[in-house]
Amino acid sequence: MNSIEKKQLLGLDLNQMEEFLLGLEEPRFRGRQVYKWIYQKECSSFYEMSDLPRSLRKKLDEKARVSIPRVLKQRVGKDGSRKFLMELDDKKKIECVLLPQSRDKKSSYTLCLSTQVGCPIACSFCATGQSGFQRNLKAFEIIGQYLGSKKELSKRLKSPRAELISNVVYMGMGEPLLNYDEVIKSVHMLNDPRGINLGQRRITISTSGEVAGIKKLAQENIQLTLAISLHACDNSLRDQLIPLNRKYPLEVLFPAIEDYIAFTGRRVTFEYLLLDEVNMSRNDANKMVKLLKPLLANLNLIPYNEIEGLPFKKPETAKIWQFYQWLQDGGLNVSIREERGSDINAACGQLRSDYRR
């Protein structure tokens, strides 16, 4: 039996895993054992599953596979950030990033996951969209980024600690809510207490404003954080920066956000890239205060990370703090995101499906 015909076990939930083992004429508890080996120990080799009978390991090797994406290359930034170039079964390539929670390089990490190969949104400031869109990722490929990153991190830091990755953000390559079903499936897999056991409130899904997905997410009863990539507070500018705004302009997007907050009771995070001489005027600040002040919301300001071939520039520090002060004076709950990973092109908007530097 070749690898194409083998059953992909990565991506199965516990019930599905147990049913698969029952189909191999094995007791149900063997499914629980295999499930733990995959999701708690990042194990992709059946022969390393030491508490399984040798005969079962051989049977699994003949009939199943666990395809954790292969790490082709890793880059480590000065701040301890780690960017992984990973290869999928069909040779497509994606990137994901581990960001340290603090600069001591000994803390836990936030993992930034990709959900698509490329991105169809084609935001004008973003490296990912410049490469075009190829396909959606399956849930097992999304979870595989978590398992592959954690395995690599544990190996390099020589630490098996389960808490090495304490938070997950769906902010890598792609628009998560355009791959809705697979993303939500991966969220449930991350959260499963019998497997990875990552708390729902440690998970963030970021969207450029996919209103249909926001409406569906409000019905899921998942206590995650929704982040909105805003970047402009009027339609004319946002149309230029985020083409999706032409489908879902602000007067459509914000009622959906208000409904989401009302239905879930969860605070929404807004992300705002600071683009020098583009979206940082006093008028921009006033518009943002008017939009966000009525909402249960946090605002993260993100100084732009410059990308070769794109015209946008990072603002000077004084301009950043002036804009911050206007927003704070307007009564917003605002913070400036500390830069992570920019020296290895791993910061916001810098991910591609290859290494160009």
Curated annotation (Swiss-Prot):
Gene: rlmN
Start and end residues of each Radical SAM core domain: 105-343
HAMAP family for the chain: RNA_methyltr_RlmN (MF_01849)
Domain of life, source organism: Bacteria
Residues binding S-adenosyl-L-methionine: 174-175, 206, 229-231, 305
Alphabetic keyword roster: 4Fe-4S, Cytoplasm, Disulfide bond, Iron, Iron-sulfur, Metal-binding, Methyltransferase, rRNA processing, S-adenosyl-L-methionine, Transferase, tRNA processing
Protein family (similarity comment): Belongs to the radical SAM superfamily. RlmN family.
A Pfam family annotated for this UniProt entry: Radical_SAM
EC number from the UniProt entry: 2.1.1.192
Stated name of the protein: Probable dual-specificity RNA methyltransferase RlmN
Residues annotated to bind [4Fe-4S] cluster: 119, 123, 126
Cofactor note: Binds 1 [4Fe-4S] cluster. The cluster is coordinated with 3 cysteines and an exchangeable S-adenosyl-L-methionine.
Organism of origin: Syntrophomonas wolfei subsp. wolfei (strain DSM 2245B / Goettingen)
Active site, renumbered: 95, 348
GO biological process entries: rRNA base methylation; tRNA methylation
Intracellular or extracellular location(s): Cytoplasm
Annotated disulfide bonds: 112-348
One cellular component term from this protein's GO annotations in UniProt: cytoplasm
Note: Reaction proceeds by a ping-pong mechanism involving intermediate methylation of a conserved cysteine residue.
